[in-house]
Amino acid sequence: MAPRKNKTVKEEVQVSLGPQVREGEIVFGVAHIYASFNDTFVHVTDLSGKETISRVTGGMKVKADRDEASPYAAMLAAQDVAEKCKSLGITALHIKLRATGGNRTKTPGPGAQSALRALARSSMKIGRIEDVTPIPSDSTRRKGGRRGRRL
């Protein structure tokens, strides 16, 4: 077939993800760190929390299942997230730290502190740190039965 006569060439428009920023300007994101005793999630969103920028878990960084919640896996996940944030122009983070909560444990898992530390060491500025663990006002019954867990 012969080429068409009235065909116009469209110019490709360069689309960049993330906010348009000037040099030295601080752009905030929100890092949601969910540290249970089985895994650690490091999830960075924009300030509204609706747009995900990057999400990495400890299980994505290590091979063995037993190491998913380890501080080392959390550190690798946080470094990965920080690198992605920098490439998209986010220079500072507010931290929302969460444990399992509800009628389960209210203490964060072993990866929480190392994930937070890794974000701080990767030249990301830290804004506010907030604990958003769900605390029940009156909960459903906890597992373990009347006499509790017997070892």
Curated annotation (Swiss-Prot):
InterPro entries: Ribosomal_uS11, Ribosomal_uS11_CS, Ribosomal_uS11_sf
UniProt entry keywords in alphabetical sequence: Ribonucleoprotein, Ribosomal protein
UniProt key word Protein biosynthesis: no
Molecular function per GO: structural constituent of ribosome
Region listing for Disordered, in residue ranges: 130-151
One Pfam match: Ribosomal_S11
Annotated SUPFAM superfamilies: Translational machinery components
GO cellular-component term (any): ribonucleoprotein complex
Biased composition annotated in UniProt, kind: Basic residues: 142-151
GO biological process: translation
HAMAP family named in the record: Ribosomal_uS11
Family from the record: Belongs to the universal ribosomal protein uS11 family.
Stated name of the protein: Small ribosomal subunit protein uS11
Organism: Aedes aegypti
Lineage of origin: Eukaryota, Metazoa, Ecdysozoa, Arthropoda, Hexapoda
Gene: RpS14
